[in-house]
Amino acid sequence: MGRLGDILNNYAKQNPVRFHMPGNKGKINFNISTDVTELFFTDNLYNPDADTGIIHELEDKIVKCFFPNANHIHSIISCGGATLCIQAAILSLLRFKNNLSDCGQEKYLICDRASHISLINTLALLNITPLWIYSDDFIEFIEDYSKIYGNEILGVFVTSPNYYGRIKDIKAISEVCRKYSLTLVADNSHGSHLAFYSSGELHPINAGADISVDSVHKTLPALTGAAVLHTNKKFDKELLLRSSMRVFASTSPSFLILQSIEAMIEYLTAHGYDGHKVLLENINQFRNEAEKIGFAFDYFSTEPYRIVLSAKLSESSDNINSGKFLYDYLCDKNIFCEFYDSDSVILIPSILNTKNDFDVLLDALRQFASKYKFYSQPSVKVTEANISTNSVVSINLSQALKLPRKKILTDNAINKISAEAVSFYPPGIPIILPGELIDENNINYIKQIREYIDVIDM
């Protein structure tokens, strides 16, 4: 076995408490002998056979599992993660809007600026101009953009929930989208499990979105790369979406991922609602006990399962990252979380996390509290806060990706045009985009990420 295999096997052997993706928590196994290519009896994921019915049957089960009381919903499987779903959704909007008379005209997409890098790359590939929304006031922005750009707008793209568990008012956004006949796409990558919360009202499809991108591997028991694209009756374009997916997808989808989705649906059909109810009880009990010993949680997080744990060290200075300090401490206790920022640690639990996992976590936090001085400070920091709202776009996204580039020291990049998107990953929200002018307001942030940066060679 090579080095990577050794590292991963050693991690698995130490039986870690996993509060990171994927949602399977290392508890599902598949025989590699079932990893095959498309054969006459396996069906073809991106061009399924209506007669064989294997893929369609599985997708129908997904609909019934996620939306048992809904009608006219299609679910399309992706083995290329949420990125492939986003690519397919945006290309479908473009194809749906385009016709021979206006296909050469500029097209726009109203977008949440705190969108994942996969959306940025998709816009660049398809030469679509983003109309950014920088605040939570989506309604006003959609109204204003619609009045200015009219029929040239392809639709609206929102991220909900985000990495920090902050959910947007999809119902209100969908209502204004209907007013202007705009298709609403929700990047629900971090909220697939919300279909099993209460009556499912927090899932974007149930809240009014036309298309939802569910990266099921993040919070549900499936293999990494498993995702599902849901669409409702307003954008009832299953064949168009599937055709668009074929443009970007590998012609060799993973049948191991497909099997994991099938196993996930079987598990969720039996345990989805009850299991998530128990998980929420464990999370709420953990929150209550952690608060008693001085820890705080992000009060902006409205996603009931996401844990944003804050502990600002009393002796903290500019040279001490409180979030990293707590993250590293938990790693030493064999507890591995998703990521950290300057003040917080983000944990992603799933239905496969046990009560014992939370007990072990709480015990570690009690030890931390007895050893270090810190004060409660609910996290208000988000990566999006570093995004400039007045960035100068010198070259559009599509052109910026195609032009010659050179690598220079970040210190020397002021007033240069970025040739790449720069972001911490996770959460993958770019602080600066290809084609934007690098200024002093974001240079210090960029220096935290990388010493060198690609700029347009002009």
Regions found by a protein language model. Name each.
Residues 2, 49-56, 83, 206, ...:
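Electropositive phosphate-/nucleotide-binding environments in soluble metabolic enzymes
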Residues 45-50, 64, 77-78:
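Asp/Glu-centered strand-loop micro-motifs enriched in Gly/Pro and often flanked by an aromatic residue
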Residues 36-45, 64, 125-126, 130-132, ...:
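Gly-rich Lys/Arg/Thr-decorated short loops/hinges at beta-loop-alpha junctions or inter-strand turns
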Residues 291-437, 445-451:
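Conserved C-terminal alpha-helix-loop-beta "cap" of PLP-dependent enzymes
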Residues 453-458:
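Charge-dense polyanion-binding interfaces
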Residues 4-9, 57, 65, 72-75, ...:
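Conserved PLP-enzyme active-site core in the AAT-like
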Residues 26, 163, 218-219, 234-236, ...:
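Short, glycine-/Ser/Thr-/acidic-enriched flexible segments
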Residues 1-53, 182, 427:
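N-terminal "arm"/small-domain region of PLP-dependent enzymes with the aminotransferase-like
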